[in-house]
Amino acid sequence: MSSVYSDKSSSTPAVTGGGFGGEIMLFGVRVKVDPMRKSVSLNDLSQYEHPNANNNNNGGDNNESSKVAQDEGYASADDAVQHQSNSGRERKRGVPWTEEEHKLFLLGLQKVGKGDWRGISRNFVKTRTPTQVASHAQKYFLRRSNLNRRRRRSSLFDITTDSVSVMPIEEVENKQEIPVVAPATLPTTKTNAFPVAPTVGPIIFPVQIDKSREYPTLLRHDHGNSSMLVGPVPMFSMPNPSTAIDLNANHNSTIEPSSLSLRLSLSLDQGQASSTRHSAYNVMSSFSNGESIIRVA
Protein backbone atom coordinates (compact mmCIF):
# COMPACT_ATOMS: atom_id res chain seq x y z
CA MET A 1 0.00 0.00 0.00
CA SER A 2 2.80 2.32 0.81
CA SER A 3 4.39 1.67 -2.51
CA VAL A 4 1.20 2.50 -4.32
CA TYR A 5 0.81 5.83 -2.63
CA SER A 6 4.39 6.61 -3.18
CA ASP A 7 4.05 5.93 -6.84
CA LYS A 8 1.04 8.17 -7.08
CA SER A 9 2.65 10.91 -5.10
CA SER A 10 5.71 10.72 -7.22
CA SER A 11 3.69 10.86 -10.37
CA THR A 12 1.58 13.83 -9.36
CA PRO A 13 4.00 16.60 -10.24
CA ALA A 14 4.67 14.87 -13.46
CA VAL A 15 1.03 14.95 -14.39
CA THR A 16 0.45 18.51 -13.42
CA GLY A 17 3.76 19.79 -14.43
CA GLY A 18 3.91 17.84 -17.63
CA GLY A 19 0.86 19.58 -18.79
CA PHE A 20 -1.21 16.46 -19.38
CA GLY A 21 -4.52 18.00 -20.29
CA GLY A 22 -7.87 16.82 -19.11
CA GLU A 23 -6.80 15.32 -15.78
CA ILE A 24 -6.10 16.66 -12.32
CA MET A 25 -5.08 15.04 -9.07
CA LEU A 26 -7.49 15.83 -6.24
CA PHE A 27 -6.61 14.35 -2.88
CA GLY A 28 -4.65 11.65 -4.55
CA VAL A 29 -7.42 10.82 -6.99
CA ARG A 30 -7.02 11.34 -10.68
CA VAL A 31 -10.02 13.30 -12.02
CA LYS A 32 -10.84 14.01 -15.64
CA VAL A 33 -11.85 17.57 -16.37
CA ASP A 34 -14.11 17.21 -19.47
CA PRO A 35 -16.90 15.09 -17.94
CA MET A 36 -16.82 17.32 -14.92
CA ARG A 37 -17.26 20.50 -16.94
CA LYS A 38 -20.33 19.06 -18.60
CA SER A 39 -22.01 18.62 -15.26
CA VAL A 40 -20.93 21.96 -13.81
CA SER A 41 -23.90 24.04 -15.09
CA LEU A 42 -27.13 22.91 -16.67
CA ASN A 43 -28.27 26.44 -17.54
CA ASP A 44 -26.48 26.75 -20.84
CA LEU A 45 -25.61 23.30 -22.19
CA SER A 46 -26.17 24.44 -25.78
CA GLN A 47 -23.27 26.84 -25.46
CA TYR A 48 -21.01 24.00 -24.27
CA GLU A 49 -22.13 21.60 -26.99
CA HIS A 50 -21.59 24.16 -29.78
CA PRO A 51 -18.70 26.29 -28.62
CA ASN A 52 -17.39 27.00 -32.09
CA ALA A 53 -20.78 27.98 -33.49
CA ASN A 54 -21.41 30.40 -30.66
CA ASN A 55 -18.00 31.98 -31.08
CA ASN A 56 -18.61 32.51 -34.77
CA ASN A 57 -22.06 34.03 -34.21
CA ASN A 58 -20.90 36.61 -31.65
CA GLY A 59 -20.65 39.30 -34.30
CA GLY A 60 -23.61 37.99 -36.29
CA ASP A 61 -27.30 38.56 -36.04
CA ASN A 62 -28.82 38.20 -32.58
CA ASN A 63 -32.11 37.02 -34.05
CA GLU A 64 -30.54 33.81 -35.35
CA SER A 65 -29.02 32.97 -31.98
CA SER A 66 -32.31 33.65 -30.27
CA LYS A 67 -34.12 31.40 -32.73
CA VAL A 68 -31.62 28.60 -32.10
CA ALA A 69 -32.02 29.02 -28.37
CA GLN A 70 -35.81 28.96 -28.69
CA ASP A 71 -35.67 25.80 -30.78
CA GLU A 72 -33.48 24.07 -28.18
CA GLY A 73 -35.79 25.16 -25.35
CA TYR A 74 -33.41 27.56 -23.60
CA ALA A 75 -34.80 30.93 -24.71
CA SER A 76 -34.27 33.85 -22.38
CA ALA A 77 -37.24 35.58 -20.78
CA ASP A 78 -35.71 38.97 -21.55
CA ASP A 79 -35.82 38.23 -25.26
CA ALA A 80 -39.55 37.54 -25.10
CA VAL A 81 -40.20 40.75 -23.16
CA GLN A 82 -38.17 42.76 -25.62
CA HIS A 83 -40.08 41.26 -28.52
CA GLN A 84 -43.42 42.28 -26.95
CA SER A 85 -42.20 45.79 -26.18
CA ASN A 86 -41.17 46.27 -29.79
CA SER A 87 -44.63 45.34 -31.02
CA GLY A 88 -46.39 47.70 -28.58
CA ARG A 89 -43.90 50.54 -28.78
CA GLU A 90 -46.56 53.11 -29.73
CA ARG A 91 -48.66 53.83 -26.68
CA LYS A 92 -52.34 54.38 -27.19
CA ARG A 93 -53.20 57.85 -25.99
CA GLY A 94 -56.60 58.68 -24.59
CA VAL A 95 -58.98 61.26 -25.98
CA PRO A 96 -58.67 64.50 -23.96
CA TRP A 97 -61.70 65.85 -22.15
CA THR A 98 -63.60 68.65 -23.77
CA GLU A 99 -64.86 71.74 -21.98
CA GLU A 100 -68.45 70.56 -22.33
CA GLU A 101 -67.64 67.22 -20.70
CA HIS A 102 -65.81 68.96 -17.87
CA LYS A 103 -68.79 71.23 -17.20
CA LEU A 104 -71.08 68.23 -17.13
CA PHE A 105 -68.66 66.56 -14.72
CA LEU A 106 -68.80 69.60 -12.42
CA LEU A 107 -72.57 69.62 -12.58
CA GLY A 108 -72.68 65.95 -11.65
CA LEU A 109 -70.23 66.64 -8.84
CA GLN A 110 -72.63 69.23 -7.45
CA LYS A 111 -75.70 67.05 -7.80
CA VAL A 112 -74.35 63.62 -6.84
CA GLY A 113 -71.23 64.37 -4.82
CA LYS A 114 -67.79 62.82 -4.56
CA GLY A 115 -67.31 59.11 -4.96
CA ASP A 116 -70.31 58.22 -7.09
CA TRP A 117 -68.38 58.15 -10.34
CA ARG A 118 -70.69 55.53 -11.77
CA GLY A 119 -73.70 57.80 -11.27
CA ILE A 120 -71.89 60.77 -12.81
CA SER A 121 -70.88 58.65 -15.80
CA ARG A 122 -74.37 57.24 -16.23
CA ASN A 123 -76.44 60.40 -15.78
CA PHE A 124 -74.17 63.29 -16.73
CA VAL A 125 -70.97 62.46 -18.63
CA LYS A 126 -72.35 59.65 -20.76
CA THR A 127 -69.37 59.65 -23.12
CA ARG A 128 -66.95 58.55 -20.36
CA THR A 129 -66.60 55.39 -18.32
CA PRO A 130 -66.66 55.45 -14.50
CA THR A 131 -62.89 54.75 -14.47
CA GLN A 132 -62.24 57.75 -16.71
CA VAL A 133 -64.48 59.92 -14.53
CA ALA A 134 -62.61 58.83 -11.40
CA SER A 135 -59.24 59.56 -13.03
CA HIS A 136 -60.45 62.97 -14.17
CA ALA A 137 -61.75 63.73 -10.67
CA GLN A 138 -58.39 62.79 -9.15
CA LYS A 139 -56.57 65.15 -11.49
CA TYR A 140 -59.12 67.87 -10.79
CA PHE A 141 -58.75 67.69 -7.00
CA LEU A 142 -54.95 67.54 -7.21
CA ARG A 143 -55.01 70.62 -9.37
CA ARG A 144 -57.22 72.45 -6.91
CA SER A 145 -55.06 71.49 -3.91
CA ASN A 146 -51.84 72.60 -5.61
CA LEU A 147 -53.31 75.76 -7.05
CA ASN A 148 -51.94 78.08 -4.37
CA ARG A 149 -48.46 76.58 -4.24
CA ARG A 150 -47.21 77.58 -7.64
CA ARG A 151 -48.52 79.10 -10.77
CA ARG A 152 -49.28 76.83 -13.64
CA ARG A 153 -50.41 77.37 -17.13
CA SER A 154 -54.13 77.52 -17.69
CA SER A 155 -55.90 74.27 -18.32
CA LEU A 156 -59.33 72.75 -18.34
CA PHE A 157 -59.21 72.17 -14.58
CA ASP A 158 -59.32 75.92 -13.92
CA ILE A 159 -63.06 75.76 -14.57
CA THR A 160 -64.48 75.10 -11.11
CA THR A 161 -67.91 74.66 -9.64
CA ASP A 162 -67.85 78.31 -8.55
CA SER A 163 -67.41 79.59 -12.08
CA VAL A 164 -69.95 77.24 -13.59
CA SER A 165 -73.49 78.29 -12.82
CA VAL A 166 -76.05 75.60 -12.21
CA MET A 167 -77.12 74.86 -15.72
CA PRO A 168 -80.80 74.07 -15.95
CA ILE A 169 -80.16 70.87 -17.44
CA GLU A 170 -80.90 72.79 -20.48
CA GLU A 171 -77.42 71.78 -21.46
CA VAL A 172 -77.86 68.35 -20.15
CA GLU A 173 -81.44 67.87 -21.10
CA ASN A 174 -80.46 70.79 -22.63
CA LYS A 175 -80.52 74.29 -23.47
CA GLN A 176 -83.10 74.00 -26.20
CA GLU A 177 -86.48 75.43 -25.35
CA ILE A 178 -89.03 76.30 -27.99
CA PRO A 179 -89.86 79.99 -27.67
CA VAL A 180 -93.51 80.68 -27.09
CA VAL A 181 -94.88 82.90 -29.80
CA ALA A 182 -96.81 85.75 -28.28
CA PRO A 183 -100.22 86.32 -29.81
CA ALA A 184 -100.34 89.21 -32.20
CA THR A 185 -102.02 92.23 -30.78
CA LEU A 186 -103.79 94.84 -32.76
CA PRO A 187 -101.95 98.15 -32.92
CA THR A 188 -103.47 100.70 -30.63
CA THR A 189 -103.32 104.40 -31.24
CA LYS A 190 -102.72 106.67 -28.30
CA THR A 191 -105.05 109.61 -28.12
CA ASN A 192 -104.65 112.58 -25.87
CA ALA A 193 -107.30 112.49 -23.23
CA PHE A 194 -109.05 115.80 -22.91
CA PRO A 195 -112.49 116.75 -21.65
CA VAL A 196 -115.11 117.19 -24.31
CA ALA A 197 -117.97 119.52 -23.72
CA PRO A 198 -121.35 117.91 -24.08
CA THR A 199 -123.24 119.36 -27.02
CA VAL A 200 -126.94 119.86 -26.87
CA GLY A 201 -128.67 119.42 -30.18
CA PRO A 202 -132.18 120.33 -31.05
CA ILE A 203 -134.69 117.77 -29.92
CA ILE A 204 -137.65 117.60 -32.22
CA PHE A 205 -140.67 115.68 -31.12
CA PRO A 206 -144.35 116.15 -31.84
CA VAL A 207 -146.40 118.04 -29.32
CA GLN A 208 -150.12 117.70 -29.18
CA ILE A 209 -151.85 120.82 -27.95
CA ASP A 210 -155.29 120.66 -26.54
CA LYS A 211 -156.88 124.03 -27.25
CA SER A 212 -160.02 123.31 -25.32
CA ARG A 213 -158.32 123.48 -21.91
CA GLU A 214 -155.52 126.03 -22.29
CA TYR A 215 -157.42 128.44 -24.51
CA PRO A 216 -161.15 128.06 -23.84
CA THR A 217 -161.92 131.13 -25.95
CA LEU A 218 -160.82 129.35 -29.06
CA LEU A 219 -163.58 126.76 -28.69
CA ARG A 220 -166.19 129.29 -29.70
CA HIS A 221 -164.64 130.07 -33.02
CA ASP A 222 -163.03 126.71 -33.76
CA HIS A 223 -165.44 124.37 -35.41
CA GLY A 224 -162.74 122.22 -37.07
CA ASN A 225 -160.05 120.09 -35.54
CA SER A 226 -159.66 120.47 -31.79
CA SER A 227 -155.94 119.57 -31.76
CA MET A 228 -153.06 119.96 -34.11
CA LEU A 229 -149.45 118.60 -34.31
CA VAL A 230 -146.68 121.16 -34.17
CA GLY A 231 -142.94 120.57 -34.59
CA PRO A 232 -141.11 123.02 -32.36
CA VAL A 233 -138.11 124.91 -33.60
CA PRO A 234 -135.32 125.71 -31.14
CA MET A 235 -135.07 129.33 -30.06
CA PHE A 236 -131.22 129.37 -29.87
CA SER A 237 -128.52 128.94 -32.41
CA MET A 238 -126.10 126.04 -32.13
CA PRO A 239 -122.57 127.08 -31.22
CA ASN A 240 -119.65 126.27 -33.50
CA PRO A 241 -118.09 122.93 -32.46
CA SER A 242 -114.62 124.44 -32.85
CA THR A 243 -115.37 126.99 -30.14
CA ALA A 244 -116.97 124.47 -27.82
CA ILE A 245 -113.71 122.49 -27.27
CA ASP A 246 -110.58 124.24 -26.20
CA LEU A 247 -107.44 122.18 -26.98
CA ASN A 248 -104.48 123.75 -25.30
CA ALA A 249 -101.08 122.32 -24.33
CA ASN A 250 -102.11 121.52 -20.79
CA HIS A 251 -105.42 120.06 -21.89
CA ASN A 252 -107.19 122.24 -19.37
CA SER A 253 -110.49 123.63 -20.45
CA THR A 254 -113.09 125.34 -18.42
CA ILE A 255 -116.52 124.84 -19.84
CA GLU A 256 -119.35 126.86 -18.52
CA PRO A 257 -122.62 125.04 -18.27
CA SER A 258 -125.03 126.05 -20.95
CA SER A 259 -127.52 128.61 -19.73
CA LEU A 260 -129.88 127.76 -22.48
CA SER A 261 -132.46 125.16 -21.83
CA LEU A 262 -135.32 123.98 -23.80
CA ARG A 263 -138.43 124.47 -21.85
CA LEU A 264 -141.56 123.17 -23.30
CA SER A 265 -144.24 124.63 -21.20
CA LEU A 266 -147.15 122.87 -22.63
CA SER A 267 -148.95 121.69 -19.64
CA LEU A 268 -152.40 120.26 -19.66
CA ASP A 269 -153.34 121.71 -16.32
CA GLN A 270 -155.16 125.03 -15.93
CA GLY A 271 -153.13 125.96 -12.83
CA GLN A 272 -149.80 126.07 -14.74
CA ALA A 273 -151.06 128.37 -17.50
CA SER A 274 -149.68 131.47 -15.74
CA SER A 275 -146.15 130.01 -15.47
CA THR A 276 -145.95 129.34 -19.20
CA ARG A 277 -146.30 132.96 -20.32
CA HIS A 278 -142.68 133.12 -21.33
CA SER A 279 -142.81 130.04 -23.49
CA ALA A 280 -140.95 129.82 -26.75
CA TYR A 281 -144.21 129.42 -28.55
CA ASN A 282 -146.61 132.27 -29.20
CA VAL A 283 -150.11 131.22 -29.99
CA MET A 284 -152.21 133.63 -31.98
CA SER A 285 -155.75 133.10 -32.99
CA SER A 286 -157.40 134.47 -36.01
CA PHE A 287 -161.10 134.72 -36.11
CA SER A 288 -161.37 135.75 -39.70
CA ASN A 289 -161.86 132.30 -41.08
CA GLY A 290 -162.86 130.69 -37.80
CA GLU A 291 -159.46 128.87 -37.39
CA SER A 292 -156.76 129.09 -34.77
CA ILE A 293 -153.19 129.77 -35.97
CA ILE A 294 -150.05 128.86 -34.06
CA ARG A 295 -146.93 130.79 -34.98
CA VAL A 296 -143.45 129.97 -33.81
CA ALA A 297 -141.26 133.04 -33.27
Curated annotation (Swiss-Prot):
Function in brief = Binds selectively to the DNA sequence 5'-[GA]GATAA-3' and may act as a transcription factor involved in the regulation of drought-responsive genes. Enhances stomatal closure in response to abscisic acid (ABA). Confers drought and salt tolerance.
Q: Where in the cell is it found?
A: Nucleus; Cytoplasm, Cytosol
The protein's name is Transcription factor MYB1R1
Under the heading SUPFAM superfamilies, the entry gives: Homeodomain-like (SSF46689)
| Record-level GO cellular component terms | cytosol; nucleus
- Report the Gene3D superfamilies cross-referenced here: Homeodomain-like
> Per its UniProt record, what NCBIfam families does this chain match?
myb_SHAQKYF
The upper taxonomy is: Eukaryota, Viridiplantae, Streptophyta, Embryophyta, Tracheophyta
